[in-house]
Curated annotation (Swiss-Prot):
Keywords: Cytoplasm, Hydrolase. Belongs to the urease gamma subunit family. This is Urease subunit gamma 1. Pathway: Nitrogen metabolism; urea degradation; CO(2) and NH(3) from urea (urease route): step 1/1. It is found in: Cytoplasm. InterPro entries: Urease_gamma, Urease_gamma/gamma-beta_su, Urease_gamma_sf, Urease_subunit. Its main location: cytoplasm. HAMAP family: Urease_gamma (MF_00739).
Amino acid sequence: MELTPRDKDKLMLFTAGLLAERRKAKGLKLNYPEAIALISCEIMEGAREGRTVAEMMGAGREILTRDDVMEGVPEMIESIQVEATFPDGTKLVTVHSPII
């Protein structure tokens, strides 16, 4: 199987998102890379399922709370930008203050 560099990046992000999801399910607080990966992965999956950019911008703020992450992580993440594939093409989704 031949993957483009972009496909490899998406696969690595998805794998990191799965790991973060498992750790969250165990009750562990997520660190910075895990929080970014989980939110990004959820946005990419929502886009693939046919949700809109506006829906994903809103949903991106509901994935994690301060209680889900280590101290200081919410302040480190001012915004997240994810290039996601929607049914009508690839679009950039920006989520401001994703952890409230």
